[in-house]
From Swiss-Prot:
Catalysed conversion reaction: succinate + ATP + CoA = succinyl-CoA + ADP + phosphate; GTP + succinate + CoA = succinyl-CoA + GDP + phosphate
Keyword Ligase: yes
Cofactor: Mg(2+)
UniProt organism field: Azoarcus sp. (strain BH72)
GO biological process: succinyl-CoA metabolic process; tricarboxylic acid cycle
Name of the protein this chain belongs to: Succinate--CoA ligase [ADP-forming] subunit beta
GO molecular function: ATP binding; magnesium ion binding; succinate-CoA ligase (ADP-forming) activity; succinate-CoA ligase (GDP-forming) activity
Domain ATP-grasp: 9-244
Keyword Magnesium listed: yes
UniProt similarity note: Belongs to the succinate/malate CoA ligase beta subunit family.
Subunit structure: Heterotetramer of two alpha and two beta subunits.
Binding-site residues, ATP: 46, 53-55, 99, 102, 107
Broad enzyme group: ligase
């Protein structure tokens, strides 16, 4: 689960991390009022969407008068903001953050994250703040410092000092940086985040350290422990089909291809998508029905896939372990009839009650194409949609 920047800063402030003063707004008048309340001579008008690259996309502007704040807020609020993370369709800006200006002397990057390659908790920092960290990792990997943290010991002073010195924090500001790093790590652990990122972390002209921007990703499986985090959820920022799928315990992610995929098990689902790509087509979605799929779940899965106008065919790939093939077959037949399926459907199933499942499909009277292997299934569905 993702949250907005202003919400991320609220979370950080609860742990003692210093951020600029800011006020979230939902209208132009609120934006002007917020600037008046904050005072000063310069304000930052920031679009709030669940995507990075907002500045490059025109979603972050400086206002040097209240009239300018009003103009900028009017331009940004309601715009379809396109960044490298939103895709070409962009995301609509429905809320703003009006923030006091900052005297930026230097920008850094710091994050606490789950390092999948090593299966460890890591603290990562760079002297190249304010940039896309993936870009830095690709072009100048030597400018990224990473330390691995023992969860039982936590981030030690020595590790935090190593990070601060490694990214060039001035000696006088190292104690503040160390304090910020340790608070960020504690926040990351206690909120069950998979990523807690400050980018940029700034050094001000007076030597103070502040979190100028922040981003969190939270482990959705741990949200039951954090109702205060769940309260931050903004459904407007999420895919409507993904929200609908979650109501039926379906793991669904929309993609850009034209072949719908319905699979049981995340690993098999990813292998299925890879196989589709291998045979020259693109998957339209990731969809894992899990090990306890019912006829209702399968029907809803079909409905969700077919909402996407780009879907020209569907591939069902089932391994019958916990899930019985005849159960899936019954669900597939019922779903195809209920939605009046009009696109090609290829079904490949192996495992428990496989023969019974194939019999149900064969006797359904529907034009369902059977396959025995993943390669055969992919070949057939790709041929059907071309």
């Amino acid at each position: 689960m993702k949250i907005h920047e202003y919400q991320a800063k609220e979370v950080l402030r609860k742990y003692g991390v210093v951020t600029p003063r800011g006020i979230p707004c939902f209208s132009v008048d609120e934006a002007v009022k917020a600037a008046e309340e904050l005072g000063g001579k310069i304000w930052v008008v920031k679009a709030q969407i669940h995507a990075g690259g907002r500045g490059k996309g025109g979603g972050v502007k400086l206002g040097k008068s209240l009239d300018e704040v009003r103009t900028l807020a009017g331009q940004i609020l309601g715009m379809q903001l396109v960044t490298h993370q939103t895709g070409p369709e962009g995301q609509k800006v429905r809320r703003l953050l009006i923030e006091e200006g900052a005297d930026i002397k230097k920008e850094y990057y710091v994050a606490a994250l789950t390092d999948r390659a090593t299966q460890k908790v890591a603290m990562m920092a760079s002297s190249e703040g304010g940039m896309d960290i993936e870009e830095v990792a690709h072009n100048t990997p030597e400018k990224i410092i990473k330390v691995f943290v023992d969860p039982l010991a936590g981030l030690t002073d020595a590790q935090a000092i190593e990070l601060a010195k490694g990214i060039g924090v001035p000696e006088a500001s190292i104690p503040q940086a160390v304090d910020t790093f340790k608070k960020l790590y504690t926040c990351y652990m206690e909120t069950d985040a998979s990523l807690a990122e400050i980018n940029p972390l700034i050094l001000e002209g007076n030597g103070n350290i502040k979190a100028l921007d922040a981003k969190f990703n939270f482990d959705s499986n741990a949200l039951f422990r954090h109702p205060e985090i769940v309260a931050y959820r903004d459904l407007d920022e999420e895919d409507a089909d993904e929200i609908e799928a979650s109501k039926f315990d379906l793991a669904y992610i929309s993609l850009d291809g034209n072949i719908g995929c319905l699979v049981n098990g995340a690993g098999l689902a990813m292998a299925t998508m890879d196989t589709i790509k291998l045979f020259g087509a693109e998957p339209a979605n990731f969809l894992d029905v899990g090990g306890g799929a019912t006829t209702e779940k399968v029907t809803e899965a079909f409905k969700i896939m077919l909402k996407n106008p780009k879907v020209k065919g569907i591939l069902v790939n089932i391994f019958g372990g916990i899930m019985k093939c005849d159960t899936i077959a019954t669900g597939v037949v019922a779903a195809a009839k209920e939605v009046n399926l009009s696109v090609p459907l290829v079904v490949r199933m192996k495992g428990t009650n496989e023969d019974l499942g194939k019999k149900i499909l064969a006797e359904s009277g529907l034009p369902i194409i059977s396959a025995d292997t993943m390669a055969e299934a992919a070949t057939k569905i790709v041929a059907e949609v071309k």
